[in-house]
Curated annotation (Swiss-Prot):
Name of the protein in question: Actin-like protein ARP10
Gene Ontology BP terms: actin filament-based movement; establishment of mitotic spindle orientation; mitotic cell cycle
Lineage: Eukaryota, Fungi, Dikarya, Ascomycota, Saccharomycotina
Keyword terms of this UniProt record: Cytoplasm, Cytoskeleton, Dynein, Microtubule
UniProt record similarity statement: Belongs to the actin family. ARP10 subfamily.
The encoding gene: ARP10
InterPro entries: Actin (IPR004000), ATPase_NBD (IPR043129)
Molecular-function annotations in GO: nucleosome binding; structural constituent of cytoskeleton
Length: 284
């Protein structure tokens, strides 16, 4: 069964694809466009086709796919993905799970603020009991592209993303807020009983190991945060997630089946829909 479960990690600048039985992705492909649309639909199709061919699963109607998605992926993008996987490759099932939840699972926690440093922007996603707290999600345009052209001091490459001594909320756009300020804003806006468990458990994604110590110390200094984690085994967590979700017998409410898609080709799973929020219980 695990040989027919395919995991797809949709990153800000890359796509990783592999089987759930493997310890790491088999293919890592640059995806510079970031978003998915009709213009790059054919390119995405070729990525899937190449992988299905090398794994000898092209034409296998039992293939199930789990998409580890960006928290801001649109329903339109999901429809394109589903259309490719169902119409072009006749897959049996497609499920979507926010990457932030998988990173929590990889860190063996149900509660955290997950910071994902992307190419064009950075997201801060509060997770409680493995549920994204939608109304408290924030993002900043401070991403990797902003610091790529800089010549940083040793260990300080990501400093402008996380902290800015000259930052003044009155003079800056809301979407240009440094990440540490975003996290503070999230914590202050949370219900009182949720503040401590999330403030004390920060997960940071897409930071090179050489910069981890600097960022960890910065958070401890500016936020008195007790636990900073940089997940390394998200692929294994995604595999475990796939086995739980895709082996569930019955109505899988975080994904759609082939027949369901053909009955309604406009359908697309939306994690923030009420029924999808209740479905997270199956990850326990």
């Amino acid at each position: 069964m695990s040989n027919t479960i395919v995991i797809v990690y949709l990153g800000a600048n890359r796509i990783e694809i592999g089987r759930s039985a493997d310890a790491c992705p088999q293919e890592i492909i640059a995806w510079k466009t970031g978003s998915i649309n009709e213009k790059n639909r054919e390119e995405l199709k070729k990525i899937f086709e190449h992988y299905f061919q090398i794994c000898n699963i092209l034409g296998n109607r039992e293939v199930q796919v789990l998409i580890l998605e960006d928290i801001f992926i649109s329903v339109v993008e999901k429809r394109i993905i589903c259309s490719i996987l169902f119409k072009e490759f006749d897959c049996a099932h497609v499920s979507f799970v926010p990457r932030a939840i998988v990173h929590c699972l990889s860190c063996n926690t149900r509660n955290a603020i997950v910071i994902d440093i992307g190419t064009n922007y950075t997201t801060c996603v509060p997770i409680f009991d493995l549920r994204p707290l939608q109304q408290f999600i924030k993002y900043s345009k401070r991403g990797k592209r902003q610091v790529e052209s800089r010549i940083p001091l040793p260990g300080s490459l990501y400093m402008p993303i996380f902290f800015d001594e000259e930052y003044n909320s009155k003079n800056c756009e809301v979407d240009e807020t440094p990440v540490i300020n975003l996290v503070k804003n999230i914590v202050e806006s949370l219900p009182i009983d949720l503040r401590r468990p999330l403030r004390e458990n920060i997960i940071i994604v897409n930071i090179e190991e050489a910069y981890e110590t600097v960022i960890r110390n910065l958070f401890k200094l500016k936020m008195d945060t007790s636990k900073i984690q940089f997940p390394k085994n998200y692929w294994q967590a995604g595999s475990a997630c796939a086995k739980i979700l895709l082996h569930y017998k019955g109505s899988n409410i975080v994904g759609i089946e082939r027949d369901e898609f053909y009955n309604n080709p406009h359908i697309a799973p939306d994690w923030f829909d009420y029924y999808f929020r209740t479905g997270v219980k199956r990850l326990q």
